[in-house]
UniProtKB/Swiss-Prot annotation:
Record key words, sorted: Cytoplasm, DNA-binding
Gene Ontology, cellular component aspect: bacterial nucleoid; cytosol
Source organism: Lactobacillus gasseri (strain ATCC 33323 / DSM 20243 / BCRC 14619 / CIP 102991 / JCM 1131 / KCTC 3163 / NCIMB 11718 / NCTC 13722 / AM63)
The name this protein goes by in its record: Nucleoid-associated protein LGAS_0369
Domain of life where this protein originates: Bacteria
GO-annotated molecular function: DNA binding
Upper classification of the organism: Bacteria, Bacillati, Bacillota, Bacilli, Lactobacillales
Length: 109
């Protein structure tokens, strides 16, 4: 007499249900990612002298630099402002991604 493998009490119907549920979750995640990609996120430096705009898929779309930020005698200041704005923009994307996708990844890591 052959025995079927034991899946911890899960019959094949339950396994198919899990697969169906996983596919549905994958579709929902892909829809969330597509939605995020259409959104814009902004990072601003001190006094809004540099403004970096990102898409939800972390692509830099625009970088505006106020002419007051351009001082030939102090290029380090402009570098710091750009870094600050870019980092804040990336953080805004990451925060939105976590808020949107966190419900799917909770407990997986």
């Amino acid at each position: 007499m052959s025995r079927r493998p034991n899946f911890g009490g899960m019959g094949m119907g339950n396994m198919q249900g899990l697969i169906k549920q996983a596919k549905k979750m994958q579709q929902q995640m892909e829809a969330e990612q597509a939605n995020l990609a259409t959104q814009e996120f902004v990072g601003k430096s001190a006094d809004d002298m540099v403004v970096a705009t990102f898409s939800g898929d972390r692509q830099l779309k625009d970088l505006k630099i106020d002419k007051e930020a351009i001082d030939p005698d102090d290029p380090d200041m402009l570098q710091d402002l750009v870094i600050d704005a870019v980092n804040k923009g990336i953080k805004a994307v990451d925060d939105a991604t976590q808020a949107s996708m966190g419900k799917y990844t909770k407990g997986l890591m």
